[in-house]
């Protein structure tokens, strides 16, 4: 198309037709040529079904954790609005009419989880309190005008059952200037006359109300402008008698932030009540307890993989949502990289799948390190059968999977019992949380550790009431399981409780040890001290333990035997690779990225990411065809704290000129030198933007280097 025209100054070019990018189904990623793709679709389907179960359990868990908090909030809102509806004529009631009911919701610093909580809270308030629930964020409210504009539009969107006349009123409200007067008049004409839809539960609780309240949720209150909050609260308090507003402050830090943002003259207009959500660590403990410390889900994490997820949670974001995403990534990586993960399902289904295993899949079982160790410990005849007979191998694999299932049932029951014993000990030698105890048990035989020995010594000093309380908790744990694997253990513990109850509470008389002195004899201090020490040693060696001490020792020995029998590390179990994900490094690379290392790698060795053969170079060499920023970066690594821009530019031009093989005497090279200079300026600007250099006032033609070392 010609672009030379006297009359035209703008030329239109139709874009080239591009083929629509074909989306690849996610299950096709399991068909990797580098990996064995046998049963890839079945593996993906197993992963999908298992994740749906975990996701459903997680959603139910979060609803249960927030249920108590939401119930308290609903009670507060209903009570506050009911008191507002009582038109008392006394002076105190008139003063309270200017106080806006406010709920300060302390959610913690895990801001990424707040959206889920606010969505659930909004739905709960819609169903139980009022249809007028609005959530605002600080980015949408830079001033009072935008604050009221956003509030008005959200309130209008909340009304879903209105006639055409009311819609005209809404359009008129949108066209008018946004103010609290117009909003109050709209509310009086629409909300009170329309009678919005209510559920039967809400109608029963709110039948005495003349009009439903307006609940305004301010997400992350710390982000709002102080002036905007102050002005809005003052204006709203003056219209509270005609616009029943209730505020909910979402606070991530501390309730003190309310008094820091609002002066006393403004905070006195609020009737504040605090509500505390469950702490992040307690939430994590519950999630681990329901998802990993249970035989309900066959998928498990190794010690290192679990530590990666918990460390990211504890030292980075405190986000339960990110922890669950990490768990999902672990599940996906396990089914993607482990061909035998097809057996990571319910026991009955796994047995059916083993029956149809091919020869290749049977060979994969034989190659498992845990199975090879198991074969080496078997008699010679059984070894030959396991290595040559496919039918016998399938039967033995089914038996081993069943043993692994029983192992997990007993493992988690005994783990909880041990946690009941050790969670209240001084200084918590085995950890305060069950996840700490679980990580220790995953790593090694816990009874070989010094912490375990110190815990047993402390347990041998427990009082009768403390010991009986712990044993009762253990009985509840063992009876909570539908399996009958440890039923004898529960009966044994009940027997210990019966023996404790039958003990005589009175102190037992101690037998007199040693002969009584015949008479008082004069002696010096040395011989007196020697005699007292001998008598003390004699009492210690000849003293008999009481019945309680003997029974307590029996209980501790019984628990010790349980731990040694059932808390064996999972790495010693045959076929543990089928259900345990242990690629902690892969998980760390995906979730705990190091941007500075990645940036250094990209600039220092562009071939690592671009995969261009021309970018390959020896260590310490600068490829002449590398991107400009890579050349400038590698040159700046050779400089000291201050970099001369002239020398840097000449070195850059030398490298680029070597790449393009230009003749320095030609006019083209002179023109190209300007282009090279512009390229250098752009590369330096990009390095400054990335934070590698900065201008300095020491020398005008120098820049200061900001980074040192390899990255």
Curated annotation (Swiss-Prot):
Please provide, in alphabetical order, the Gene Ontology terms of the cellular component aspect for this entry: chromatin; DNA replication preinitiation complex; nuclear origin of replication recognition complex; nuclear pre-replicative complex; origin recognition complex
- Any one GO molecular function term: DNA replication origin binding
Say yes or no: keyword Coiled coil present. Answer: no
Cite the post-translational modification comment.
Answer: Multi-mono-ubiquitinated by OBI1; ubiquitination is important for efficient DNA replication origin site activation. Ubiquitination levels are low in mitotic and early G1-phAse cells and are induced in late G1-/early S-phase, peaking in S-phase and decrease toward the end of the cell cycle.
The Gene Ontology biological process terms listed for this entry are: DNA replication initiation; glial cell proliferation; neural precursor cell proliferation; regulation of DNA replication
Q: Which gene is annotated as encoding this protein in its UniProt record? A: Orc3
Q: Which family does it belong to?
A: Belongs to the ORC3 family.
Q: Which protein is depicted?
A: Origin recognition complex subunit 3
Q: What PANTHER family is this protein classified in?
A: ORIGIN RECOGNITION COMPLEX SUBUNIT 3 (PTHR12748:SF0)
Q: Does the keyword DNA-binding apply?
A: yes
Taxonomy, superkingdom: Eukaryota
Q: What is its main location?
A: nucleus
One Pfam match, given by its short name, reads ORC3_ins
Q: Which UniProt keywords apply?
A: Chromosome, DNA replication, DNA-binding, Nucleus, Phosphoprotein, Ubl conjugation
Q: Which organism is it from?
A: Rattus norvegicus (Rat)
What does the UniProt entry say about where the protein is found?
Answer: Nucleus; Chromosome
| Sites of Phosphoserine modification | 23, 515
Signal peptide limits? none
Q: Subunit notes for this chain?
A: Component of ORC, a complex composed of at least 6 subunits: ORC1, ORC2, ORC3, ORC4, ORC5 and ORC6. ORC is regulated in a cell-cycle dependent manner. It is sequentially assembled at the exit from anaphase of mitosis and disassembled as cells enter S phase.
Function, as annotated, reads: Component of the origin recognition complex (ORC) that binds origins of replication. DNA-binding is ATP-dependent. The specific DNA sequences that define origins of replication have not been identified yet. ORC is required to assemble the pre-replication complex necessary to initiate DNA replication. Binds histone H3 and H4 trimethylation marks H3K9me3, H3K27me3 and H4K20me3.
